[in-house]
Amino acid sequence: SKYPSTNIQIEVFKNQIEIIKKSNYSFNNPDNFKEEFDIPKLNKEVLITIDDAFQSFYLEAWPYLKKNKIPFILFVSTEPVGRRGYMTWDQIREVESKEFAFIGHHSHTHNYLIDETNDQFILDIEKANRIFVKELGYIPSLFSYPFGEYSKFMRDYISKNFEFAFGQHSGVIDINKDKFELPRFCLLYTSDAADECDS
């Protein structure tokens, strides 16, 4: 697969979900996450995020999430949509039509944007914005930095144009976290995979 360090086998994924349930965590709906971010939580909650909109997600994880109505954010990079190994816009719209499924912004190219100029970065985001409006009718308000990497300029630009942004550094989200540098934990490819998430 393209990014093996952040992929997960479907049976391992299902097992992780069951562990979360048995540990008395609830699944946070992204709408509630946005509205209640500044409110301290008494209960343990998990927000599921999925990057890249691979076809494998649609064929394997999506049926399970749909059956169980588990809320999640699917972060989409607009350039690869419809290419080999990636979901189509029709499939993305199908997912997005469910009230528990949310589409997030993951740039246009999914390049290492931190290595590009500030102008190139802005052009990439703006191109994705135009495609999102054409295909979905809106620009997603949640952003995920490609490869979890960002500069101060990128963070500041995203903060002016989105509601929240996620990296790939590990950590628990609480009200003291920067809304545009939110951490995430990886659900890893196999149960004994390495602990580091690097792509």
Model region roles, listed by residue range:
Residues Y189-E196:
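Conserved small/polar residues in nucleotide/adenosyl-binding loops
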Residues F147, Q168-S170:
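Short secondary-structure boundary segments
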Residues N29-P30, S56-E60:
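Extended catalytic core of nucleotide-activated donor transferases of GT-like folds
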Residues S1-V46, S199:
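N-terminal pre-catalytic segment of deacetylase/amide-hydrolase enzymes
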Residues I70-F75, F162-Q168:
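Short hydrophobic/aromatic-enriched beta-strand-loop microsegments
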Residues S1-P4, N43-V46, Q55, K66-F153, ...:
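Metal-dependent polysaccharide deacetylase catalytic core of the NodB/CE4 family, i.e.
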Residues D51-A53:
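Noncatalytic alpha-helical scaffolds and linker/capping helices
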Residues I125, M154-F166:
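Short, electropositive alpha-helical surface patch
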